[in-house]
From Swiss-Prot:
One Pfam family hit: UDPGT
PROSITE patterns for the chain: UDPGT
Protein name (database record): Putative UDP-glucose glucosyltransferase
Example of a GO MF term: quercetin 3-O-glucosyltransferase activity
Gene3D superfamilies: Glycogen Phosphorylase B
Protein family: Belongs to the UDP-glycosyltransferase family.
InterPro entries: UDP_glucos_trans (IPR002213), UDP_glycos_trans_CS (IPR035595)
Alphabetical list of PANTHER family matching this protein: GLUCOSYL/GLUCURONOSYL TRANSFERASES, UDP-GLYCOSYLTRANSFERASE 84A1
Gene source species: Fragaria ananassa (Strawberry)
The organism's taxonomic lineage, starting at the top: Eukaryota, Viridiplantae, Streptophyta, Embryophyta, Tracheophyta
Keyword terms of this UniProt record: Glycosyltransferase, Transferase
The protein's Enzyme Commission number: 2.4.1.-
Keyword hit for Coiled coil: no
Gene this chain is encoded by: GT5
C-alpha cells in the first residue's frame, strides 16, 4: 500500500444527489481506487450528511481501497434546510445545482492542484449534471460520463436529440419507435420523459443536456454488459466512445470494502431469509424514488395474501420534502401474514437478491435493480412507472426473457388489481414458466460473471480507461 501524493493519478467523481446515481458512481470509484488511483467522490452536502450517518464516512480522509485510496468531499447546494421541498422541484433544483455547483466544484479541483497536492487527472459525471463537462473543458481536464441506464435507453435519448428517428409528438402521441439495432418500441415503451405528454418533462430535458455536451466527454462508461446489448453497443460505438463496464456491483474490486453509498441504514433481514426454503420468497422493492398510490399498495397486499407466497417487502418512508404520507397496510394484514412475510424500510438489496431463498423480484425496473436481478440470476415481475423503467421492463420480458409483465407504467393510468398480482406472482414462482424464467436468468448471471472476470469485456474496458487517463496525466 502506497501513500497519497502528487504522483497519484487522481479521478474526481461528481455525482447527482440521488440514491440511484450514487450507488453505481461509488462502485466505479471503489474499482478505480483498488487499481491504485486516488479517487475523490463528490456530491451535495445534503446527501453527504446522509452518507455519513448511514455509513460512517469521514470527509477528506483518504480511505485505503486495494492499491489506492478513496476520499469524500461534498459541496453546498445553498439550501440549508435538509427537508427543503424545493429539492424535489427539479425545474428549480437542476438549474440551481448548475449555478452553485460549477463554481464550487471548480474551486475544489483547483485546490487539489495547489501546494503539492494530487492534481485532478480526469472528471467523471453522471446524468442531470452535464455542466461538469463544462468545468472540465474550462480547466483543460479530460471528462468521462458514467451512463447509469441501459445502452438501449442511451440510444433512445441520442436519436431523439439528433432527430434521426421519429418519436411520439402531440399530433401523433401513439407513434411507435424503431431505433437502430433494437426491437420496435411501442409509444409507452420509450423512456417516458421523451413523450410529449409526460408530466416529468424536466427530467427528459435534464438528461438531454448530457447529449448536447456529448462531444465534451472523452469516454461514455456504461453500467451495462457488452454481451447483454451487443448490437446496440456496436451501433452506438460508431458515434461515440461507448465502453460497457458493468455490472459495476459485481466487480470484485468494487465489493471487497465496507464503503457503501446507502443513504439510510439497511434493516436486518438476512437471518429471516435464511429461515425460508430455497426459491420460496418474493422480494418487493420499488426503489428510492417511486411512490405508489395507497390504493395500489392495498391491491398488492391483498394479492400477496391470496397467493400465499412468502415475501420480503421494502416500504421506505417518504422524505418529508416529498409531501406525501407513509403507506399503511390493510387492517389485519400483518396478523394474517405472520412469519410468512417481513416488512423493512430498506434492505441490503445485493445480498437479498443473491440469497438462495429468493424466488423472484417484484420491481419498478430501475436500471440498478434490473441489472442486479439479471446478473444474480433472479426472475422478475415488472411494475415500471416512468422514465427508463418502462423500456427496461420491455427488455426484461421480451428480450432477456427473465420477467413477467404486471403493468406498463403510469401512462397506462389504471389500478393493477389483486387478482392480477396473485396470478403473476404464482406464475413467476411455481410451474413451467417459473422454470423457464429461472433458466434464462441463470444464463445472464453467467454472462455477467464472465464480463467482470479478469480478461472479460468489462474488465478490459475499465483497464483501457485507466491506461488512457494515466497516459493523459503524464502528458
Amino acid at each position: 500500500m502506497g501513500s497519497v501524493g502528487s504522483d497519484n493519478t487522481h479521478i474526481f467523481l461528481v455525482c447527482y444527489p440521488a440514491q440511484g446515481h450514487i450507488n453505481p458512481m461509488l462502485r466505479l470509484g471503489k474499482y478505480l481506487a483498488a487499481k491504485g488511483l486516488l479517487v475523490t467522490f463528490s456530491t451535495t452536502e445534503d446527501y453527504g450528511n446522509k452518507m455519513r450517518n448511514a455509513n460512517g464516512i469521514v470527509d477528506n480522509h483518504p480511505t485505503p481501497v486495494g492499491n489506492g485510496f478513496i476520499r469524500f468531499e461534498f459541496f453546498d447546494d445553498s439550501l440549508p434546510d435538509p427537508d427543503d421541498p424545493r429539492r424535489t422541484n427539479l425545474e428549480f433544483y437542476v438549474p440551481l445545482l448548475e449555478k452553485v455547483g460549477k463554481e464550487l466544484v471548480t474551486g475544489m479541483i483547483k485546490k487539489h492542484g495547489e501546494e503539492g497536492g494530487a492534481r485532478v487527472s480526469c472528471l467523471v459525471n453522471n446524468p442531470f449534471i452535464p455542466w461538469v463537462c463544462d468545468v472540465a473543458t474550462e480547466l483543460g481536464i479530460p471528462c468521462a460520463t458514467l451512463w447509469i441506464q441501459s445502452c438501449a435507453v442511451f440510444s433512445a435519448y441520442f436519436h431523439y436529440n439528433a432527430e434521426t428517428v421519429k418519436f411520439p409528438t402531440e399530433a401523433e402521441p401513439e407513434l411507435d419507435v424503431q431505433l437502430p439495432s433494437t426491437p420496435l418500441l411501442k409509444h409507452d415503451e420509450i423512456p417516458s420523459f421523451l413523450h410529449p405528454f409526460d408530466p416529468y418533462a424536466i427530467l427528459g430535458r435534464a438528461i438531454l443536456g448530457q447529449f448536447k455536451k456529448l462531444s465534451k466527454s472523452s469516454y461514455i462508461l456504461m453500467d451495462t454488459i457488452q454481451e447483454l446489448e451487443p448490437e446496440i453497443v456496436e451501433e452506438m460505438s460508431k458515434v461515440c466512445l461507448v465502453k460497457p463496464v458493468g455490472p459495476l456491483f459485481k466487480i470484485p474490486e468494487a465489493t471487497n470494502t465496507t464503503i457503501r453509498g446507502d443513504l439510510i441504514k439497511a434493516d436486518d433481514c438476512l437471518d429471516w431469509l435464511s429461515s425460508k426454503p430455497p426459491a420460496s420468497v418474493v422480494y418487493i422493492s420499488f426503489g428510492s424514488i417511486v411512490y405508489l398510490k395507497q390504493e395500489q399498495v392495498d391491491e398488492i397486499a391483498h394479492g400477496l395474501l391470496s397467493s400465499g407466497v412468502s415475501f420480503l417487502w421494502v416500504m421506505r418512508p417518504p422524505r418529508k420534502a416529498a409531501g406525501v404520507d407513509m403507506h399503511v397496510l390493510p387492517e389485519g394484514f400483518l396478523e394474517k401474514v405472520g412469519d410468512n412475510g417481513k416488512l423493512v424500510q430498506w434492505s441490503p438489496q445485493e445480498q437479498v437478491l443473491a440469497h438462495p431463498s429468493l424466488a423472484c423480484f417484484l420491481t419498478h425496473c430501475g436500471w440498478n435493480s434490473s441489472v442486479e436481478a439479471l446478473t444474480l440470476g433472479v426472475p422478475v415481475v415488472t411494475f415500471p412507472q416512468w422514465g427508463d423503467q418502462v423500456t427496461n421492463a420491455k427488455y426484461l420480458v421480451d428480450v432477456f426473457g427473465v420477467g413477467l409483465r404486471l403493468c406498463r407504467g403510469v401512462a397506462e393510468n389504471r389500478l393493477v388489481l389483486r387478482d392480477e398480482v396473485e396470478k403473476c406472482l404464482l406464475e413467476a414462482t411455481v410451474g413451467e414458466k417459473a422454470v423457464q424464467l429461472k433458466h434464462n436468468a441463470l444464463k445472464w448471471k453467467k454472462v455477467a460473471e464472465e464480463a467482470v472476470a479478469e480478461g472479460g469485456s468489462s474488465q478490459r474496458n475499465l483497464h483501457d480507461f485507466i491506461d488512457e487517463i494515466a497516459r493523459t496525466s503524464i502528458a
